UniProtKB/Swiss-Prot annotation:
Residues binding 3'cADPR, per UniProt: 288-289, 355, 373, 390, 398, 402
Protein name: NAD(+) hydrolase ThsA
Effect of residue 166 to E: NADase no longer activated by 3'cADPR
Oligomer and partners: Homotetramer; with a core of two SIR2 dimers flanked by SLOG dimers at both sides. 3'cADPR binding is likely to induce changes in the orientation and position of the SLOG domains.
Consequence when changing residue 254 to E: NADase no longer activated by 3'cADPR
Catalyses which reaction(s): NAD(+) + H2O = ADP-D-ribose + nicotinamide + H(+)
Free-text comment on this protein's domains from its UniProt entry: Has an N-terminal sirtuin-like domain (SIR2, residues 1-282) and a C-terminal SLOG (STALD)-like domain (residues 283-473). Dimerizes via the SIR2 domain. The SIR2 domain probably has NAD(+) hydrolase activity. The SLOG domain binds 3'cADPR; binding alters the protein conformation, probably allowing NAD(+) to access the active site.
Result of changing residue 170 to R: Has NADase activity without 3'cADPR
Annotated NAD(+) binding sites: 115, 153
Gene Ontology terms: biological process: defense response to virus
Annotated spans, SLOG (STALD) domain: 283-473
Species: Streptococcus equi subsp. equi (strain 4047)
Record domain Deacetylase sirtuin-type: where: 3-282
Family membership: Belongs to the soluble Thoeris ThsA family.
């Protein structure tokens, strides 16, 4: 039980964020704190020299918005613009937290930051961001994008439109970005937000959540979550800061915002890594090829793959497959069978990435195969290995390559030993290397002897996948 009203446990935080992921309703709100590891020096440090230029001491100023206004008044707006461009154009390398956020199925990002770190992270993860910084960009669009990034305070490329001075805040919602508040209100009503690096001291944001609370009353506001660093014993004025933090957590709870406290910022990365890992484990890479089906007859081997793919789809997993000979077509059949029976879209359950068979226009097939395998595997969390033989190879080299890539990308490998070929080789290697009890349990479950009963084999493999998607974290 928590002393502070509005504080949540790590387990509850992850569970609620996963619910939002499952319903495709997760949004992220990114504040300046997330950019500090990338080189952002904090607003106080940013304004230290400007304050000295106008005869002030930043340490004696509690209102940095007013300080920015004084500097703008004294040195003209272009000086503020140069300050923004000089600081934020240097932030070019996304942090680990930005990278992890880009791997989650988040289609809506809001940020008060001027930098391009989240956009860059999305692009590096093969996603197209659509950045919106002004009202004209809010109207309907046919743009092909994977995520919208709303920049509440503007962008480094147009510093003259950035919100930083008192005058900028006064004009926000009236002369500039008139519609941004309404769009943010809509997203706060329909999505579950995770706030990271955000201080909740921004007047524009506080206006929006205050308006929603009044319109809906506290009982009907949607739940959102934030992660903050706990005030530490060694901090100056510890008792005062601790009391203030507790009061802030209780106050945020009025707006439906629940807080998880970390002792160090590295814990944020750990939480995001857990979320990414658990999300990826809902996507399963099936690796394999089969010129022959080991101890199975051809018909039984084909039915085994069909039934396994059907049951994985039935349990809500998405399958990725490279359409290897003797395996891919029956993976497709199994998923298609499920989707037709349950009136579902096959794209929601299956991604096929076949390998080109012949070179054209001088394409290097080996290079293309490697890139194809990388793209297949990097989005998955579990790899199931079936059979793995070819007409001229008892142990298919391509399946072994996929095993090495799976390890490189951190997938949990589930080789089915009794299907023979590369899968048996991978089983022998994996069981010698792993020490994680959960993974060992899953591999043992998947490889229980069933005396050729493919229905029982399929049941055991699906159960192994469920073990790897355990509730504990």
């Amino acid at each position: 039980m928590f002393i502070i009203k509005g504080e949540v446990s790590r387990k509850d935080l992850i569970r609620e964020i996963e619910k939002a992921i499952k319903s495709d309703e997760l949004g992220a709100f990114i504040g300046a704190g997330l950019s500090i590891p990338a080189g952002f020096c904090s607003w106080k440090e940013l304004l230290r020299e400007p304050a000295e230029e106008i005869g002030l001491d930043v340490e004696k100023e509690s209102d940095l918005v007013n300080l920015a206004q004084y500097y703008s008044n004294s040195k003209k707006r272009t000086s503020i613009d140069d300050l923004i461009k000089g600081q934020f154009s240097q932030l070019v390398k996304p942090t680990e937290n930005h990278k992890l956020l880009s791997q989650l199925p988040i289609s809506t990002f809001w940020t008060t930051n001027y930098d391009k770190l989240i956009e860059k992270a999305l692009e590096n993860n093969m996603k197209k961001p659509y950045v919106k910084t002004k009202d004209e960009q809010l109207r309907g669009t046919n743009h092909n994008f994977d995520a919208i990034v709303y920049k509440l305070h503007g962008d480094v490329e147009t510093p003259e439109d950035a919100v930083i001075t008192r005058s900028d805040y006064e004009e926000f919602g009236y002369n500039k970005r008139k519609l941004f508040r309404e769009v943010l209100e809509g997203d706060l009503l329909t999505k579950t937000f995770l706030f990271l690096g955000f201080s909740f001291e921004d007047p524009n944001f506080n206006y929006v959540i205050g308006r929603l609370r009044v319109l809906l009353d506290e009982k009907n506001t949607r739940k959102h979550y934030c992660i903050m660093k706990r005030v530490q014993d060694a901090d100056e004025d510890y008792e005062y800061k601790k009391a203030r933090q507790e009061l802030q957590i209780e106050d945020l709870n009025r707006y439906g915002i629940f807080t998880y406290l970390v002792n160090k910022y590295d814990e944020i990365t750990e939480i995001l890594s857990t979320l990414v890992d658990r999300f990826r484990r809902k996507t399963i890479f099936i690796s394999g090829s089969a010129y022959s089906y080991s101890a199975y007859s051809q018909k039984t081997g084909e039915n085994f793959i069909h039934k396994l793919s059907f049951e994985l789809s039935k349990n809500g997993y998405h399958i990725v497959n490279g359409y290897g000979k003797g395996v891919g077509e029956f993976v497709l059949n199994g998923v298609a069978d499920y989707c037709l029976t349950h009136k579902s879209k096959i794209n929601d359950f299956l991604t096929l990435m076949p390998f080109p068979q012949n070179s054209s226009l001088g394409i290097d097939l080996d290079k293309l195969y490697k890139e194809n395998r990388e793209q297949m595997i990097e989005s998955c969390g579990i790899a199931i290995f079936l059979f793995g033989n070819k007409e001229a190879e008892d142990i298919a080299s391509g399946v072994m390559d996929e095993y090495e890539l799976s390890k490189k990308h951190g997938l949990v490998c589930l080789p089915i030993e009794y299907t023979g070929g590369a899968s048996k080789e991978i089983y022998d290697q994996t069981t010698q290397e792993i020490s994680d009890k959960n993974t060992i349990s899953a591999i043992e479950q998947a490889n229980k002897q069933c005396d050729g009963d493919i229905d029982m084999s399929v049941k055991n493999i699906v159960q192994a996948v469920k073990i790897l998607n355990k509730e504990e974290f």
